Design a protein with these regions (language model features):
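Intracellular loop-helix junctions on the cytosolic face of multi-pass helical membrane proteins
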Residues: 7, 16-17, 21-22, 28-151, ...
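Intracellular juxtamembrane helix-capping segments at the cytosolic ends
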Residues: 16-29, 260-274
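Helix-to-loop junctions at the C-terminal end of transmembrane segments
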Residues: 209-221, 304
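A late C-terminal transmembrane helix in Major Facilitator Superfamily
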Residues: 276-307
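Single conserved hydrophobic/aromatic residue that forms the stacking wall/gate
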Residues: 1-6, 11
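Loop-to-transmembrane helix entry/capping segments in MFS-fold secondary transporters
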Residues: 31-41, 273-285
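Loop-to-transmembrane helix entry
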Residues: 75, 166-204, 315-321
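C-terminal ends and interior cores of transmembrane alpha-helices
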Residues: 7, 230-242
Length: 340
């Protein structure tokens, strides 16, 4: 329970720290440069992710314990969280001090906000009704993308443990029903967990590299489609790979999709917004990140059970294939986005 509460607080607080800066890009950067600005944000986010994945290995290498009793978090992970919190606080303070927002009058002139529109009373429901079409079409793409990555975060560990490290299985009894599951106490499972951390670091490297390439592609929708298709290929390829090092290629491709997801939706949406309420719209747009993850987390177990034959271990790799299919569907949905 404490782990769940802690995870929820980390996710919530990181969103609270990051979203205002996404809004500032929309407020302060002109339309021609927004794509580059959001790509720079994507680059920096993924560089931070890479550092976060590497910190536990660095601490273990310098002698800080990465082993702990059951139910206890290793010191290497604890210190990584401390360092991450310190970096977050320092970066937020630095950005808040150094970045000067537009004065209200200049902001209104820059965004074409009239005195009458500022007096207009509205609420979130009215804003949703008046939302530009891009809000909904990009949101549809977001649904498939974030559901796919929720599957990745949930099922990669089991997939790598079974398909790559040949983790042994055991039979358990739950409410009188026997189930065949992976032996999570085995050395193979622990090794797989460590390797997944490395794979996520490789994904971050792929994202960092691809974030520098996205601004070079003139057609934004083509860049979006290409990124998601590459990510979909990466997910589907995991089904055929049984070598731990070959998985690097899969996760580099997945990183391409991740880089685009952090940059292009916000570029397209903020270019479609005019006048005021940009901050409110971006806050509402955050729902296109949360809702698909909730749906994927709620229904993923049911779908996985449909893939599982009686007396056999759940084929979690099928969920990653489904994630790849979702990204390719999302790429297809990009075609209905109409940019302003």
């Amino acid at each position: 329970l404490r782990c769940l509460v802690g995870s929820e607080m980390c996710i919530r607080d990181s969103n609270m720290a990051m979203q205002p800066f996404k809004m500032m890009v929309g407020d302060m950067v002109n339309e021609k440069q927004k794509g580059l600005a959001y790509s720079i944000q994507s680059f920096l986010c993924n560089a931070g992710s890479l550092a976060g994945y590497l910190f536990p290995f660095i601490f273990a290498a310098i002698g800080i314990s990465n082993i702990a009793p059951k139910g206890v978090i290793p010191d290497s992970v604890i210190y990584s969280f401390y360092i991450g919190a310190l970096i977050l606080i320092l970066c937020v303070i630095y950005t808040s001090v150094k970045v000067k927002e537009f004065p209200p009058e200049e902001y209104a002139a820059y965004h074409g906000i009239t005195h009458e529109s500022k007096k207009e009373k509205t609420n979130m429901f009215k804003l949703l009704v008046k939302a530009p079409k891009a809000f909904w079409t990009v949101g549809l793409v977001q649904f498939f993308c974030w559901a796919a990555f929720m599957f990745m975060w949930t099922y990669t560990n089991g997939t790598v443990a079974l398909n790559v490290f040949d983790t042994p299985v055991i039979t358990t009894m739950t409410n009188g029903v026997s189930r065949v599951v992976l032996d999570t106490q085995s050395a193979q499972y622990q090794t797989a967990g460590d390797w997944v951390g490395i794979l996520f670091a490789v994904q971050a490297i792929g994202s960092v590299i691809w974030a520098t390439i996205i601004p070079m592609i003139q057609n934004r929708k083509f860049a979006y489609v290409l990124s998601l298709v590459l990510g979909g290929i990466g997910f589907i390829s995991i089904f055929f790979i049984h070598n731990q090092y070959a998985l690097f290629a899969s996760f580099i491709l997945i990183g391409c999709a991740w880089a685009a997801m952090l940059a292009l939706p916000f570029t397209i949406l903020t270019n479609a917004l005019t006048g005021g309420h940009m901050g409110t719209y971006l806050g509402l747009f955050n729902g296109t990140i949360c809702v698909p993850q909730i749906v994927a987390a709620s229904l993923g177990g049911i779908v996985l059970k449909m893939f599982t034959s009686p007396g056999s271990v759940a084929p979690e790799v099928n969920m990653l294939v489904l994630a790849g299919v979702f990204l390719i569907i999302g790429a297809g949905c990009v075609s209905i986005i109409k940019e302003r």
